[in-house]
Amino acid sequence: MADFETPEIKEFIGIPALQEGSMAHSSPFIAYTDHQEALGYPGELVENWQQVALDKMDDLRSRYRSFQVFLDSCVKCGACTDKCHYFLGTSDPKNMPVARQDLLRKVYRRYFTFAGKYFPKLVGAEDLTEAVLDDWYSYFHQCSQCRRCSVFCPYGIDTAEISMAAREIMDAVGKGQKYCNEIIGKVFTVGNNLGLPGKALANVLEGLEEDVEDDTGVAVKFPLDVKGADILLVTPSADFFAEPHIDGLIGYAKVFHETGASWTLSTTASEAGNFGMFIGSYENMRRVSMRIRDAAKELGVKRIIFGECGHAWRIAYSFLNTLVGPFDFLDQSYPIPQHILEYTWGELEKGTLRINKEENDHMTLTFHDSCNVARGSRMGDYPGGQFDYPRNVIKAVCNNYVDMDPKTTKEATFCCGGGGGLLTDDLMEIRVKGVLPRATALKSVVENEGVTHMAAICAICKSQFTKTLPYYGFTMDQIVSVHQLVSEALVMKGSEQEAELDGTDGDDTEE
Amino acid sequence: MSFLLLIALVVFIVGVGLKIKQYAQTPAPLKIPTTPAPVTQTGVVFRMAREVVLFESLFKSNKWIWVFGWMFHVSLLLAFFRHLRYVVSPDSFMWPLVSNVIVQSFGQYAGFAMVIGLLGLLARRFLVERIRYISSPSDYLMLVMLIVIGVSGLMMSFVSHIDIVQLKMFVMGLFGFDFQNLPESTALIVHLLLVVVLLLIFPFSKLLHAPGVFFSPTRNQVDNPREKRHLSAWAAEKYNDHVDK
Ligand code: SF4
Ligand code: SF4
């Protein structure tokens, strides 16, 4: 799929001149009949699709205040026009957040507002034609629902909400996206996005136990389906096999081991990700979340902790309680649910973990704030904790840390370019172009501050970066998991690392 | 003219009222504040106040749009206060508040700032390619209309003065349904006609951003989903709140 040009990486993130239609050809594969039907959608484009689409739009605006208010309130001020990484990377004006919204808004206006019904030309209202539907399919799959635009809009208009609604409308008329819908189906049938069956999962975990023991001499367990464990760990399934995700998983396990926690994974809830959000479906998001509630009940755990994943954490933090709460059967003295970084940082603060920062001295780190964590969730008990927790943990286990340009971090962070259900090979072009702003910011700290690695806390970010940053001259192994850094620096009791450290006469870095 | 103004006012009040009712009654089923967000209700009030008074997000976003937009809105507010002298009766306790020199002269000169702000916004709409791309005819027309309202107002203030005693009688008469004649002035006719148009289109156009901002879930929600369960009526009903309590 290399029939496109990788944009040139400049010194600064610039605003491109418009190139109309430059990404009109980018569309993901359409879902097959059985993917659609498994989620309760029509198998293919229905006969009276216009009517169905309009009915759905009407239904959504009566059930989602965000949708109704956002459709009405945009004043076309243009403040958001240069905020989307896909626009910055592609120059296609329809990737400007307001223009993306307008694809839907013009139809809303035409059919549901006085001005659009009687003066369509004046207010830019348009009929819902096949061409419009094609545009929707194309451009609402060039939005990673990262919410960056919503930070900068004077009314907080969140294009992510519009994209979600658009995708739900397209599902309702039978034009769903293969990648998302196939994956959600797998979660229902197998338990995770990758369709990794229980047996395979058990094998992977066994293999990891051997690896860690070989490495450290400590028998760190990776428990699966252990009834009566205290903690249920729900983590993205990429953590079970992809690089550098898996090193993060090893990190969680070591931290649990070292703090003496009783924990378990679950076969049926072996996936933190929830693509139900990407397709805007409360129904599917709830069904996917229900597995986690069920697993927690079935295993009789007291706490639920989520592994490193961006959108999963948004859903866990912001929606889980709404969707499948209340969690009155869990131990109320812990946050429900909790992020693994909240757990690890808590332990680091307590001093239960022995850290040898020098293990990470060969690297200079920077950190990529995941969009969904940054702008759709929180960690800790104060606003902005989601920015501090990962940085605190990294700085606690590494000596060399540098932040990227503040215009590209924290609440202004750029999406990795692969979120929102775009992490699929059929969207490679938009993914490569969408990573441009992040790549630019990264390049700058690499060249000026000697940064060698970028840490991330999201399965999608990690996969997207390892795949697309090489287009810009970076290497795959420059992307690391935050808990991978913890794993490297953690000196477990009774480990070879401990012996080495205490055996040699140089002083250690115990805190 | 009296008739037109009254109709426009009714349409405005009823139209915006209905919209507000719609916004208020439409549930927000999920917690979607753009984070970092306040964790208390008081915090949300402050966030909203910063948004409405200072245009905080716009300030973060684009200084030019902020300068022009803020200038326009603040001037509009000041000009509005100045206009209160036409509706407040001199015996009212409000009179000293609206008739004092500060309100009146600020209001008078605000007209210039308002027009400058609007011209700035209009210029951007023409000159910045990205904004031109997203603009439809109504977006330009609305700015032009506001500019003409501002300029015609300034004309009456600084160029050809009108008989404001008669104007006041007209306005006071309006609300008592005792219709009086308008002072003769083209500027005044233009001014008032366009205000009529403005009031009429308000509930049917992007001017709804004014009530809309208060209902924007990304700005008005408290960030406390773990502490407090948020559930919309339709979801509770649809899933029978599904929970085996
Ligand atoms: S910043 Fe908000 S109001 Fe302005 S154009 Fe974008 S979506 Fe519309
Ligand atoms: S949500 Fe993110 S990807 Fe979507 S339009 Fe806004 S900035 Fe672009």
PLM regions: where:
Chain A
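Extracytoplasmic substrate-binding proteins
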Residues: 171, 292, 322-330, 344-360
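Iron-sulfur-cluster electron-transfer modules
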Residues: 61-71, 101, 105-323, 503-510
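Short cysteine clusters
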Residues: 74-80, 84, 143-149, 153, ...
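Iron-sulfur (Fe-S) cluster-binding segments and ferredoxin-like electron-carrier domains
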Residues: 82-110, 151-170, 378-381, 421-435, ...
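Ferredoxin-type iron-sulfur electron-transfer modules and their immediate structural context
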Residues: 1-138
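C-terminal amphipathic alpha-helical segment
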Residues: 336, 340, 346-395
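Cofactor-cradling patches in redox/metallo enzymes
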Residues: 156, 240-330, 374, 378-385, ...
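Short hydrophobic beta-strand segments
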Residues: 230-240, 363-374, 455
